[in-house]
């Protein structure tokens, strides 16, 4: 039992190297601004102009969610070429997370009975762990995401009593659980790599 507590016990070096760790996350984030910005520009264009109108004509507002991410991607991609605009690094990635992960959480909640769209949210839940966010920040994004998803379900009442919908919801819950574990592992790995640099 003591070994288990030691495994989850917070490393005292965390507090000592908090600023250095955040600085290292910002450095990693700066390297991802351009590729993530480009991906954001093109990721949802086909959905917005082609698939969404055919699959969910009752939800025309979905187009604006898609275009908002494209606009955010254009801004991030452009800003990444200007030193004054790109900031320390994480700021622009926070912007992309809001327009992709959080907006997807809300509009997927509205059409949560569509397993295809729920699977798209599952992809974002997992891939967001690869972004060099601080663990606490990522958990905040997860909490907001879950809140927005549930709020949209309560507001729009999609039919979730079918076997397909229940199966899809189970997979979504699992994706959040896996995301939490992956985020924790990656956070420990990033911090360990930083400490190893100090010890070299």
Where are these regions (language model features)?
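Hydrophobic transmembrane alpha-helices and their membrane-interface boundaries in multi-pass
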Residues: 35-128, 145-147
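Non-catalytic regulatory/interaction regions at protein termini and inter-domain linkers
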Residues: 1-28, 39-44, 55-57, 93-95, ...
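Alpha-helical transmembrane segments and their helix-membrane boundary motifs
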Residues: 26-42, 58-67, 132-143, 164-172
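Juxtamembrane or sensor-core-proximal signal-transducing alpha helices
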Residues: 173-200
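Membrane-interfacial segments
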Residues: 54-55, 59, 85, 156-160, ...
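Interfacial aromatic-anchored transmembrane helix boundaries in multi-pass membrane proteins
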Residues: 149-172
